[in-house]
């Protein structure tokens, strides 16, 4: 059978969409949904008319769909949280959720900055019981930008009353996030906002924002503020919100003209984070920046006389350092020439990654797209440019650098993740395995605490390799506490042994096996030897006090 190369959506009936739906890009969202369901590219009538060659136009659209994630509109709450996770930009050292700069922490949306290995343990009182949890920390926020028009007292925010259009796009090939939005105020003054964002893959300490605004139907002074915020807290997971949410104290905060510096230290783990931010643009003079200081945050404020139809741009570079990532702590801050220069540098780094990891699927658009989505998010969570180049002592969390579910802990998921790295980036796979080797002593302590020999790796691992699984579980139906048996999932040690063997088998890295892998295998074998009991009646060994992979 001849494959379908594509389709053309000639038009929708005149009354098919309301004017509000048309403005909100609902037609584009519908066309995309049909293309994904039909597994084939669809052109609009306008795209067909503009295409000199129809077959080339179908192929161009196919390539676009296979390399991009697009979301139209805005559904606050659980749906929005999921979209933000999927639109995360990251480079293995840091991750930024796919929010726009106007968004702040709320039930509707959740901007966050995550740094690999940034954990803190805090006690919380829940239902009469004091529990301790090691959490993946939401680091200080430097992404927030807001504006107000004329003499308005309130900053424009995203709400059903103000939002007219929102389209967010993530380029999987280059790691570039773009958001285009139209907001209106109470006087129906409309302003178009375009945000571009990258986590620089070539320089893992850096992330960059470009923020452009354009008055569509008015001219007026516009006041713009960008914030360095140390008041943020963990709020990503609804069921964790009754736990201690603030994990650090601000230890230093300063601003000088277009530059801010914030330093924080986690409350228990004593890890320091420093963020240096620099705003640039030809829409303001450094001397005209107003500084507004609070106890835990600083705002830089500029006012621009904006004219209808004219675009105005501000750029922000943020340099992130973490004391537990020693090389990042020692790297000096180097200002970039522009957002465009940083984006090109990052795109070149992504190009080298895709040269090794891209798998081409013929004749199945959605399989191709899904493969790239998964590969992209793996590389955003751990990359040769960060984990390997900076020798990060971390592994990949259950939610990557995208969110706080499972408290950012490392489980046995590595058994599904490491084959990707072993195949395409073996040196990065080795660095991820060293995370386990460096915590071998904790695994041996864990085994001894349960009267076993050898090394028993924890079901949930975080900063130092101790068992971070809760011993008690709160039943949400009856409010009673009971034993949490998930701690008995011992197969994580088998997965680690398999991963070490697979790496050696695939790479023939004998030096790794001599220095690290062999010791891990031996200690894990000792654990299972001590955990197994011979049944004299059957002549077979058995294990008990375990929970299987199906939980």
Task: Please provide the spans of the model-predicted regions.
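Conserved beta-strand/loop subsegment of P-loop NTPase cores
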Residues: 5-7
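Structural motif
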Residues: 9-13, 46-47
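Acidic/polar, glycine-enriched structural segments that form the non-catalytic walls/loops
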Residues: 17-25, 35-406
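Beta-strand segments within the central parallel beta-sheet cores of soluble alpha/beta enzyme folds
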Residues: 194, 223-226, 431-435, 513-522, ...
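A conserved hydrophobic secondary-structure block that centers on an alpha-helix together
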Residues: 201-202, 502-512, 516-519, 523, ...
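Substrate-binding groove/exosite segments of carbohydrate-active enzymes
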Residues: 344-505
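Short, glycine/acidic-rich hinge or "gate" loops at secondary-structure transitions
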Residues: 387-396, 448-450, 512-516, 533-543
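Acidic/histidine-rich catalytic neighborhood
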Residues: 523, 527-551
